[in-house]
Amino acid sequence: MTILGSISSIGNVKLISKSNNLSSLSNSSSSLQSMNSIQCGGGCGNGGLLGGVGGLVGGVLVGTGVIVGSVLHGVGSILTGGSNNCGCN
């Protein structure tokens, strides 16, 4: 019985960890949008954005390994100059 209880507790910790990762992704996403609006006016696909966001993206990927795929998808559109990067939003 004790072993089953321990396994159950470990499962709960993993779930809590995942929800913390999701909230940190949400915060990081807001930061990336803010950086994008600060650098607006540089035209579509501004290469300078890649340098400014690079360190932040690296930190997000290391800190939230569970959802790396989601981070790459969301950040990829910002770094490659998606439609959101044309002028100020």
Swiss-Prot record:
<dbReference type="Pfam" id="PF05710">
    <property type="entry name" value="Coiled"/>
</dbReference>
<dbReference type="InterPro" id="IPR008455">
    <property type="entry name" value="HssA/B-related"/>
</dbReference>
<comment type="similarity">
    <text>Belongs to the hssA/B family.</text>
</comment>
<protein>
    <recommendedName>
        <fullName>HssA/B-like protein 21</fullName>
    </recommendedName>
</protein>
